[in-house]
């Protein structure tokens, strides 16, 4: 068992570089494909939020401003991706994740979609073996916390939160939080590839946190 398809939602550029480096390290471990996804705000979603009492012209102006800002942000994210791919010349650029696995070695791709970020990211994550999410505390990327929440609770897939700075090593020492629940069992099953290759694994448990189920 291995993680062959990784998803990295790039919400902005503040924590994007560290997230890209972390995700690439994971992809190298598993010879996986890394798919970078940026979700643009759909200007049409702004109209219902505009509130009553606004004229049609004001709503159109608001939608135009949203579209412009969304486009500029998408451009910055794409530039970040292109710079990163250029620095790592050994990567193979793929047109999409569906054909990437036919290419040997680590591959990488980029896609932009429009919609509600938390919905798109959670839904797309279900198509991948694991999601790598940028650190949510970067000031520029306020929406990254929404993406993280969506992936954690709505994707059903394992999630790796990238640190503020790319680590020198990853996955060598693993901690398991166990309380006997079905959720903890599912988390352990999803983490088995990491557990098999880890140098050390520690199980954390607490009588106060224990639920009905097997003990650690």
Regions found by a protein language model. Give the residues of each.
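Small/aliphatic-rich secondary-structure junction motif
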Residues: 1-62, 154-157, 168-216
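Gly/Ser-rich helix-loop-strand patches that form or flank binding pockets
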Residues: 20-22, 27-29, 110, 118-167
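Residues at secondary-structure transition points
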Residues: 14, 68, 72, 115-119, ...
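A short acidic, glycine-rich active-site loop
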Residues: 58-75
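A structural preference for short, hydrophobic beta-strand core positions in alpha/beta folds
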Residues: 36, 94-95, 109-112, 161, ...
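Structural beta-alpha unit
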Residues: 1, 15, 41-44, 52, ...
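Short, flexible loop segments at the rims of nucleotide/cofactor-binding pockets, characterized by
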Residues: 12, 107-112, 137-140, 179-180
């Amino acid at each position: 068992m291995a993680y062959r398809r990784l998803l990295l939602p790039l919400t902005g550029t503040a924590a994007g570089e560290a997230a890209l480096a972390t995700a690439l390290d994971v992809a190298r471990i598993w010879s996986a494909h890394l798919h970078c996804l940026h979700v643009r705000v759909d200007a049409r979603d702004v109209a219902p939020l505009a509130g009553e009492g606004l004229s049609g012209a004001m709503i159109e102006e608001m939608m135009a401003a949203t579209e412009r800002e969304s486009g500029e942000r998408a451009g910055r994210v794409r530039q970040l991706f292109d710079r990163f791919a250029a620095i790592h010349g050994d990567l193979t650029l793929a047109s999409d994740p569906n054909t990437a696995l036919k290419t040997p070695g680590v591959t990488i791709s980029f896609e932009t979609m429009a919609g509600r970020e938390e919905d798109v990211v959670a839904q797309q994550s279900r198509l991948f073996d694991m999601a790598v999410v940028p650190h949510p505390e970067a000031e520029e990327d306020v929406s990254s916390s929404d993406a993280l929440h969506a992936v954690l609770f709505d994707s059903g897939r394992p999630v790796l939160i990238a640190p503020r700075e790319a680590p020198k090593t990853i996955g060598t020492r693993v901690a398991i939080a166990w309380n006997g629940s079905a959720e903890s069992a599912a988390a352990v099953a999803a983490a088995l590839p990491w557990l098999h290759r880890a140098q050390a694994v520690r199980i954390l448990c607490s009588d106060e946190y224990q639920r009905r189920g097997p003990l650690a």
